């Protein structure tokens, strides 16, 4: 697995292609800068990986174990830590900054985040059920319909699509294209939408291509 970045979703806008003039919807992501806080090797940990930290905060926002872990490498208090497996750790050093310039325009990335929470939602909003007739004496407008058989099995099977909590779960959108990289401000312009609300934490990794 290649090293990725932690970032923050800032919002959406659009840019225009110079040649065709087409408008491209893009999400602006604050990608890093992240700090390498730990390097794991096969000799000491059984596998090779690097750990990065993101989002500097006040010391009181972290626990003493977290502060002690970061002080070992003389890193600032960082809110989020994330580990990425790598084939070779020799090219990385403790305290090194990982920035948005690890990606280039045209790269494909996978972005994981927490989807927007929509609270307790019904059948139509949560599962796209078709509603009943609104006229002709129908009393079945937004009801679910049948939830299963009768005496046998005498219960509703687990996993039945019903009303409930919608959103606020970890989700990944795959194979999104990096349209533009602003290395000075550590910004990525990603084509299309990414999970979550503005201000949400994102995990940005090179896209996993099947067969490669």
Swiss-Prot record:
One of its GO terms (biological process) is translation. SUPFAM superfamilies: Translation proteins. The keyword Cell inner membrane does not apply. InterPro entries: Ribosomal_uL3, Ribosomal_uL3_bac/org-type, Ribosomal_uL3_CS, Transl_B-barrel_sf. GO terms for molecular function: rRNA binding; structural constituent of ribosome. Keywords: Ribonucleoprotein, Ribosomal protein, RNA-binding, rRNA-binding. Gene3D superfamilies: 3.30.160.810, Translation factors. Residues 133-156 are annotated as: Disordered. Transmembrane segments: none annotated. One of its GO terms (cellular component) is cytosolic large ribosomal subunit. Belongs to the universal ribosomal protein uL3 family. PANTHER family: 50S RIBOSOMAL PROTEIN L3 (PTHR11229), LARGE RIBOSOMAL SUBUNIT PROTEIN UL3C (PTHR11229:SF16). One of the primary rRNA binding proteins, it binds directly near the 3'-end of the 23S rRNA, where it nucleates assembly of the 50S subunit. Part of the 50S ribosomal subunit. Forms a cluster with proteins L14 and L19. This is Large ribosomal subunit protein uL3.
């Amino acid at each position: 697995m290649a090293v990725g970045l932690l970032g923050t979703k800032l919002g959406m806008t659009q840019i225009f292609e110079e040649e065709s003039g087409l408008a491209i919807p893009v999400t602006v992501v604050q990608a890093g800068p992240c700090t390498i806080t730990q390097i794991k090797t096969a000799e000491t940990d059984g596998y090779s990986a690097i750990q990065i930290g993101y989002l500097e905060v006040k010391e009181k926002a972290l626990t003493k174990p977290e502060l002690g872990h970061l002080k070992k490498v003389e890193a600032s208090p960082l809110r989020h830590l994330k580990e990425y497996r790598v084939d070779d750790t020799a090219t990385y050093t403790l305290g090194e900054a990982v920035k948005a310039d690890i990606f280039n325009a045209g790269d494909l990335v996978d972005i994981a985040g927490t989807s927007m929470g929509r609270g307790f939602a019904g059948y139509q909003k949560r599962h796209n059920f078709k509603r009943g007739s609104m006229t002709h004496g129908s009393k079945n407008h937004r009801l679910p319909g049948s939830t299963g058989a009768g005496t046998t099995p005498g219960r509703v099977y687990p996993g039945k699509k019903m009303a409930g909590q919608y959103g606020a779960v970890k989700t990944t959108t795959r194979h999104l294209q990096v349209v533009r990289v602003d290395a000075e401000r550590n910004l990525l312009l990603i084509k299309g939408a990414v999970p979550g609300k503005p201000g949400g934490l994102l995990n940005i990794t090179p896209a996993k291509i099947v067969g490669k």
